[in-house]
Protein backbone atom coordinates (compact mmCIF):
# COMPACT_ATOMS: atom_id res chain seq x y z
CA UNK A 1 0.00 0.00 0.00
CA UNK A 2 1.18 3.49 -0.75
CA UNK A 3 1.44 5.91 2.11
CA UNK A 4 -0.18 9.32 2.22
CA UNK A 5 2.42 11.96 2.95
CA UNK A 6 1.63 15.22 4.68
CA UNK A 7 1.00 18.16 2.41
CA UNK A 8 3.14 21.22 2.09
CA UNK A 9 1.10 24.33 2.79
CA UNK A 10 2.67 26.87 0.56
CA UNK A 11 1.83 30.20 2.08
CA UNK A 12 2.06 32.35 5.22
CA UNK A 13 -1.06 33.89 6.70
CA UNK A 14 -1.61 37.34 8.09
CA UNK A 15 -5.22 37.74 9.21
CA UNK A 16 -7.25 40.87 8.58
CA UNK A 17 -10.75 41.53 9.85
CA UNK A 18 -11.96 43.88 7.15
CA UNK A 19 -12.95 43.16 3.56
CA UNK A 20 -10.93 44.97 0.93
CA UNK A 21 -12.58 46.32 -2.16
CA UNK A 22 -9.59 47.73 -4.03
CA UNK A 23 -8.05 45.87 -6.95
CA UNK A 24 -4.97 43.91 -5.85
CA UNK A 25 -1.52 45.22 -6.74
CA UNK A 26 -0.73 42.36 -9.08
CA UNK A 27 -3.59 43.14 -11.49
CA UNK A 28 -1.57 46.07 -12.82
CA UNK A 29 1.72 44.18 -12.70
CA UNK A 30 0.47 41.36 -14.94
CA UNK A 31 -1.74 43.54 -17.16
CA UNK A 32 -5.11 42.35 -15.92
CA UNK A 33 -7.22 45.29 -17.11
CA UNK A 34 -10.85 45.79 -18.11
CA UNK A 35 -9.73 45.97 -21.73
CA UNK A 36 -8.01 42.61 -21.41
CA UNK A 37 -10.98 41.00 -19.70
CA UNK A 38 -13.37 42.33 -22.35
CA UNK A 39 -11.80 39.80 -24.73
CA UNK A 40 -13.10 36.88 -22.67
CA UNK A 41 -16.57 35.34 -22.88
CA UNK A 42 -18.21 35.54 -19.48
CA UNK A 43 -21.19 33.52 -20.75
CA UNK A 44 -19.13 30.42 -21.53
CA UNK A 45 -19.14 28.01 -18.58
CA UNK A 46 -15.64 27.61 -17.15
CA UNK A 47 -15.01 25.50 -14.06
CA UNK A 48 -11.71 25.38 -12.18
CA UNK A 49 -11.07 22.43 -9.90
CA UNK A 50 -9.45 23.37 -6.59
CA UNK A 51 -7.83 20.27 -5.10
CA UNK A 52 -7.12 21.43 -1.57
CA UNK A 53 -8.57 21.61 1.95
CA UNK A 54 -12.16 22.35 0.94
CA UNK A 55 -13.84 25.59 -0.11
CA UNK A 56 -16.39 27.64 1.81
CA UNK A 57 -18.68 29.22 -0.75
CA UNK A 58 -19.27 32.47 1.09
CA UNK A 59 -18.77 36.17 0.36
CA UNK A 60 -17.49 36.70 -3.16
CA UNK A 61 -17.64 32.94 -3.74
CA UNK A 62 -21.34 32.64 -2.82
CA UNK A 63 -22.41 32.13 -6.44
CA UNK A 64 -19.31 30.25 -7.58
CA UNK A 65 -20.10 26.69 -6.51
CA UNK A 66 -20.11 24.05 -9.24
CA UNK A 67 -19.60 20.96 -7.10
CA UNK A 68 -17.87 19.79 -3.93
CA UNK A 69 -16.34 16.42 -3.14
CA UNK A 70 -14.41 14.79 -0.34
CA UNK A 71 -11.45 12.43 -0.51
CA UNK A 72 -10.93 12.49 3.24
CA UNK A 73 -11.58 10.03 6.03
CA UNK A 74 -14.40 12.10 7.55
CA UNK A 75 -16.21 12.32 4.21
CA UNK A 76 -16.93 16.04 4.57
CA UNK A 77 -16.25 18.40 1.65
CA UNK A 78 -16.15 21.42 3.97
CA UNK A 79 -13.07 23.08 5.52
CA UNK A 80 -12.32 21.82 9.03
CA UNK A 81 -10.60 23.67 11.89
CA UNK A 82 -7.97 21.10 12.84
CA UNK A 83 -5.29 23.45 11.57
CA UNK A 84 -5.68 27.17 10.92
CA UNK A 85 -3.54 27.03 7.78
CA UNK A 86 -5.41 24.05 6.35
CA UNK A 87 -8.77 25.50 7.36
CA UNK A 88 -8.13 28.62 5.32
CA UNK A 89 -6.14 27.33 2.37
CA UNK A 90 -8.73 25.97 -0.06
CA UNK A 91 -11.08 28.93 0.29
CA UNK A 92 -8.17 31.35 -0.07
CA UNK A 93 -7.04 29.79 -3.35
CA UNK A 94 -10.57 29.64 -4.77
CA UNK A 95 -11.09 33.32 -3.97
CA UNK A 96 -7.96 34.34 -5.87
CA UNK A 97 -9.28 32.50 -8.90
CA UNK A 98 -12.97 33.38 -8.92
CA UNK A 99 -14.21 35.69 -6.13
CA UNK A 100 -16.74 38.18 -7.49
CA UNK A 101 -16.59 40.94 -4.88
CA UNK A 102 -14.71 41.96 -1.74
CA UNK A 103 -11.71 39.99 -2.92
CA UNK A 104 -11.17 40.31 -6.65
CA UNK A 105 -10.60 36.97 -8.33
CA UNK A 106 -8.61 36.89 -11.54
CA UNK A 107 -11.58 35.47 -13.46
CA UNK A 108 -14.75 36.07 -11.43
CA UNK A 109 -16.95 34.40 -14.04
CA UNK A 110 -15.42 31.00 -13.32
CA UNK A 111 -17.13 28.40 -11.16
CA UNK A 112 -15.23 26.32 -8.62
CA UNK A 113 -15.29 22.58 -8.13
CA UNK A 114 -13.95 21.93 -4.63
CA UNK A 115 -12.18 18.61 -4.09
CA UNK A 116 -11.09 18.30 -0.49
CA UNK A 117 -8.06 16.03 0.00
CA UNK A 118 -6.63 17.38 3.29
CA UNK A 119 -6.48 17.13 6.24
CA UNK A 120 -6.90 13.40 6.92
CA UNK A 121 -6.99 12.41 3.29
CA UNK A 122 -7.69 8.85 2.27
CA UNK A 123 -4.93 6.79 0.67
CA UNK A 124 -3.44 8.84 -2.19
CA UNK A 125 -6.19 11.43 -1.88
CA UNK A 126 -4.54 13.86 -4.32
CA UNK A 127 -4.28 11.19 -6.99
CA UNK A 128 -7.82 9.97 -6.42
CA UNK A 129 -9.18 13.49 -6.78
CA UNK A 130 -7.48 13.92 -10.14
CA UNK A 131 -8.55 10.46 -11.29
CA UNK A 132 -12.15 11.34 -10.50
CA UNK A 133 -11.95 14.39 -12.76
CA UNK A 134 -10.39 12.46 -15.61
CA UNK A 135 -12.99 9.70 -15.42
CA UNK A 136 -16.02 12.02 -15.32
CA UNK A 137 -17.58 11.63 -18.78
CA UNK A 138 -20.36 14.10 -17.96
CA UNK A 139 -18.14 17.17 -17.84
CA UNK A 140 -18.75 19.62 -20.68
CA UNK A 141 -15.94 21.48 -22.50
CA UNK A 142 -14.35 23.99 -20.14
CA UNK A 143 -15.49 22.20 -16.99
CA UNK A 144 -12.58 21.20 -14.72
CA UNK A 145 -10.17 21.69 -17.59
CA UNK A 146 -7.93 23.67 -15.24
CA UNK A 147 -6.93 21.88 -12.02
CA UNK A 148 -5.35 24.07 -9.32
CA UNK A 149 -3.03 22.30 -6.89
CA UNK A 150 -1.48 24.84 -4.52
CA UNK A 151 0.02 22.08 -2.42
CA UNK A 152 0.85 18.47 -3.10
CA UNK A 153 2.30 15.19 -1.99
CA UNK A 154 5.93 15.01 -0.93
CA UNK A 155 8.27 12.09 -1.48
CA UNK A 156 8.68 9.02 -3.65
CA UNK A 157 6.11 6.61 -2.20
CA UNK A 158 3.58 7.37 -4.93
CA UNK A 159 5.96 8.64 -7.62
CA UNK A 160 5.25 5.81 -10.07
CA UNK A 161 1.50 6.30 -9.69
CA UNK A 162 1.84 10.03 -10.26
CA UNK A 163 4.02 9.46 -13.32
CA UNK A 164 1.52 7.08 -14.91
CA UNK A 165 -1.40 9.39 -14.14
CA UNK A 166 0.26 12.50 -15.55
CA UNK A 167 1.54 10.67 -18.63
CA UNK A 168 -2.01 9.52 -19.31
CA UNK A 169 -3.40 13.00 -18.75
CA UNK A 170 -0.84 14.34 -21.21
CA UNK A 171 -1.89 11.84 -23.85
CA UNK A 172 -5.54 12.82 -23.38
CA UNK A 173 -4.50 16.45 -23.91
CA UNK A 174 -7.66 17.96 -22.45
CA UNK A 175 -6.70 19.11 -18.92
CA UNK A 176 -3.95 21.11 -17.24
CA UNK A 177 -2.65 20.91 -13.69
CA UNK A 178 -1.30 24.18 -12.31
CA UNK A 179 1.05 23.20 -9.49
CA UNK A 180 3.01 25.07 -6.81
CA UNK A 181 6.70 24.16 -6.68
CA UNK A 182 7.17 24.72 -2.94
CA UNK A 183 8.30 27.29 -0.44
CA UNK A 184 11.56 26.59 1.33
CA UNK A 185 13.70 28.62 -1.06
CA UNK A 186 15.48 25.50 -2.32
CA UNK A 187 17.08 24.89 -5.70
CA UNK A 188 14.92 22.01 -6.96
CA UNK A 189 17.80 20.70 -9.06
CA UNK A 190 19.73 19.94 -5.87
CA UNK A 191 16.89 18.24 -4.01
CA UNK A 192 16.56 14.50 -3.60
CA UNK A 193 13.53 12.75 -5.04
CA UNK A 194 12.26 12.39 -1.47
CA UNK A 195 12.25 16.18 -1.02
CA UNK A 196 10.29 17.01 -4.17
CA UNK A 197 6.56 17.70 -4.24
CA UNK A 198 4.12 16.08 -6.64
CA UNK A 199 2.64 16.90 -9.13
CA UNK A 200 5.21 19.70 -9.65
CA UNK A 201 7.93 17.01 -9.41
CA UNK A 202 6.77 15.41 -12.67
CA UNK A 203 9.78 15.65 -14.98
CA UNK A 204 9.16 13.71 -18.21
CA UNK A 205 12.20 12.47 -20.08
CA UNK A 206 10.94 11.27 -23.46
CA UNK A 207 10.31 13.83 -26.18
CA UNK A 208 6.70 12.68 -26.51
CA UNK A 209 5.93 13.07 -22.81
CA UNK A 210 7.71 16.42 -22.70
CA UNK A 211 5.56 17.69 -25.56
CA UNK A 212 2.40 16.41 -23.86
CA UNK A 213 3.36 17.49 -20.33
CA UNK A 214 0.09 18.60 -18.65
CA UNK A 215 1.71 20.28 -15.63
CA UNK A 216 2.49 23.99 -15.29
CA UNK A 217 4.95 24.47 -12.41
CA UNK A 218 4.71 27.86 -10.74
CA UNK A 219 7.22 29.85 -8.66
CA UNK A 220 6.40 32.97 -6.62
CA UNK A 221 7.61 36.51 -7.25
CA UNK A 222 8.12 39.25 -4.69
CA UNK A 223 5.83 42.27 -4.97
CA UNK A 224 6.75 44.49 -7.90
CA UNK A 225 5.34 47.23 -10.10
CA UNK A 226 4.72 47.13 -13.80
CA UNK A 227 7.95 48.08 -15.54
CA UNK A 228 10.17 46.84 -12.72
CA UNK A 229 12.35 43.76 -13.03
CA UNK A 230 10.74 41.12 -10.81
CA UNK A 231 12.65 38.86 -8.43
CA UNK A 232 11.64 35.63 -6.76
CA UNK A 233 9.97 35.87 -3.38
CA UNK A 234 12.47 34.81 -0.74
CA UNK A 235 12.98 34.45 2.97
CA UNK A 236 11.46 32.44 5.78
CA UNK A 237 9.15 29.53 5.10
CA UNK A 238 7.59 31.20 2.07
CA UNK A 239 10.69 31.64 -0.10
CA UNK A 240 9.95 30.18 -3.51
CA UNK A 241 11.68 27.07 -4.75
CA UNK A 242 13.39 27.54 -8.09
CA UNK A 243 15.33 25.83 -10.86
CA UNK A 244 15.66 26.16 -14.61
CA UNK A 245 13.88 23.24 -16.33
CA UNK A 246 11.97 22.52 -13.10
CA UNK A 247 9.87 25.71 -13.01
CA UNK A 248 7.77 26.74 -16.01
CA UNK A 249 6.69 30.24 -15.03
CA UNK A 250 6.74 32.71 -12.13
CA UNK A 251 3.79 34.80 -10.96
CA UNK A 252 3.02 37.29 -8.17
CA UNK A 253 3.30 35.62 -4.78
CA UNK A 254 3.79 38.21 -2.04
CA UNK A 255 1.23 40.23 -0.08
CA UNK A 256 -1.74 38.58 -1.75
CA UNK A 257 -5.13 39.25 -0.12
CA UNK A 258 -7.64 36.40 -0.02
CA UNK A 259 -10.98 35.32 1.44
CA UNK A 260 -11.20 33.11 4.54
CA UNK A 261 -13.95 30.57 5.36
CA UNK A 262 -15.18 32.89 8.14
CA UNK A 263 -15.79 35.64 5.53
CA UNK A 264 -12.86 37.70 6.84
CA UNK A 265 -9.80 38.41 4.75
CA UNK A 266 -6.18 37.42 5.12
CA UNK A 267 -2.93 38.17 3.35
CA UNK A 268 -0.45 35.53 2.30
CA UNK A 269 2.76 34.96 0.40
CA UNK A 270 4.09 31.93 -1.42
CA UNK A 271 3.76 29.67 -4.41
CA UNK A 272 0.21 28.75 -3.43
CA UNK A 273 -1.00 32.23 -4.26
CA UNK A 274 1.10 32.45 -7.42
CA UNK A 275 -0.39 29.17 -8.62
CA UNK A 276 -3.98 30.30 -8.08
CA UNK A 277 -3.31 33.50 -10.04
CA UNK A 278 -2.01 31.48 -12.99
CA UNK A 279 -5.08 29.22 -12.79
CA UNK A 280 -7.31 32.29 -12.96
CA UNK A 281 -5.59 33.51 -16.11
CA UNK A 282 -5.97 30.09 -17.72
CA UNK A 283 -9.67 30.10 -16.80
CA UNK A 284 -10.08 33.44 -18.59
CA UNK A 285 -8.32 32.04 -21.65
CA UNK A 286 -10.48 28.92 -21.60
CA UNK A 287 -13.64 31.02 -21.84
CA UNK A 288 -12.68 31.94 -25.41
CA UNK A 289 -12.39 28.32 -26.51
CA UNK A 290 -13.37 25.67 -23.95
CA UNK A 291 -12.54 22.97 -26.51
CA UNK A 292 -8.91 24.07 -26.79
CA UNK A 293 -6.36 21.38 -26.07
CA UNK A 294 -4.20 21.50 -22.97
CA UNK A 295 -1.17 21.89 -25.21
CA UNK A 296 -2.66 24.96 -26.90
CA UNK A 297 -3.42 26.66 -23.60
CA UNK A 298 -0.06 25.86 -22.03
CA UNK A 299 1.91 26.87 -25.10
CA UNK A 300 0.15 30.24 -25.31
CA UNK A 301 0.63 30.93 -21.60
CA UNK A 302 4.36 30.20 -21.75
CA UNK A 303 5.05 31.85 -25.12
CA UNK A 304 3.28 35.05 -24.04
CA UNK A 305 5.25 35.32 -20.80
CA UNK A 306 7.72 38.15 -20.30
CA UNK A 307 11.29 36.87 -20.21
CA UNK A 308 13.93 38.24 -17.86
CA UNK A 309 17.61 37.24 -18.21
CA UNK A 310 18.06 37.76 -14.46
CA UNK A 311 15.62 34.90 -13.80
CA UNK A 312 16.88 32.40 -16.39
CA UNK A 313 18.71 30.25 -13.83
CA UNK A 314 15.66 30.10 -11.58
CA UNK A 315 12.75 29.84 -14.05
CA UNK A 316 12.87 28.27 -17.50
CA UNK A 317 13.62 31.06 -20.03
CA UNK A 318 13.12 33.57 -17.19
CA UNK A 319 9.36 33.47 -17.78
CA UNK A 320 7.04 35.79 -15.84
CA UNK A 321 3.27 35.71 -16.21
CA UNK A 322 1.81 38.35 -18.53
CA UNK A 323 -1.97 38.00 -18.31
CA UNK A 324 -2.60 40.74 -20.87
CA UNK A 325 -0.52 39.02 -23.55
CA UNK A 326 -1.75 35.52 -22.71
CA UNK A 327 -5.45 36.38 -22.80
CA UNK A 328 -5.12 38.67 -25.81
CA UNK A 329 -3.05 36.20 -27.82
CA UNK A 330 -5.35 33.27 -27.08
CA UNK A 331 -8.71 35.01 -27.30
CA UNK A 332 -7.99 36.84 -30.54
CA UNK A 333 -7.18 33.51 -32.18
CA UNK A 334 -9.91 31.52 -30.45
CA UNK A 335 -13.46 32.53 -29.83
CA UNK A 336 -15.68 29.48 -29.76
CA UNK A 337 -18.18 29.85 -26.91
CA UNK A 338 -19.93 26.74 -25.69
CA UNK A 339 -23.06 27.34 -23.67
CA UNK A 340 -23.91 24.37 -21.50
CA UNK A 341 -26.15 23.89 -18.51
CA UNK A 342 -24.59 24.03 -15.08
CA UNK A 343 -24.20 20.81 -13.13
CA UNK A 344 -23.90 20.87 -9.36
CA UNK A 345 -23.48 17.97 -7.03
CA UNK A 346 -22.11 17.13 -3.62
CA UNK A 347 -20.52 13.99 -2.22
Curated annotation (Swiss-Prot):
Enzyme Commission number, as recorded:
3.4.21.-
One cellular component term (GO) for this entry is: extracellular region
* Keyword terms: Disulfide bond, Host cytoplasm, Host endoplasmic reticulum, Hydrolase, Plasmid, Protease, Secreted, Serine protease, Signal, Toxin, Virulence
Signal peptide span:
1-21
Catalytic residues at: 52 (charge relay system), 89 (charge relay system), 272 (charge relay system)
Q: List the disulfide bonds.
A: 288-331
Write out the domain note: The catalytic charge relay system lies at the bottom of a deep cleft which probably accounts for its substrate specificity. The C-terminal A2 domain (approximately residues 322-347) penetrates into the central pore of the SubB pentamer, making different contacts with each SubB subunit.
Q: Tell me how this protein assembles.
A: Forms a complex with SubB with the stoichiometry SubA1:SubB5 (called SubAB5).
- What family does this belong to? Belongs to the peptidase S8 family.
According to its UniProt entry, what is the function of this protein? Protease subunit of subtilase cytotoxin SubAB5. An endoprotease specific for host endoplasmic reticulum (ER) chaperone BiP/HSPA5, has no activity on human HSP70 or HSPA8. Cleaves between 'Leu-416' and 'Leu-417' of BiP/HSPA5 in the hinge between BiP's ATPase and protein-binding domains. This induces host ER stress response and eventual cell death. Culture supernatant of E.coli expressing both subA and subB are toxic for Vero cells (African green monkey kidney cell line), Chinese hamster ovary cells and Hct-8 cells (human colonic epithelial cell line); the subunits are not toxic individually.
Protein name, as recorded: Subtilase cytotoxin subunit A
Species this protein is from: Escherichia coli
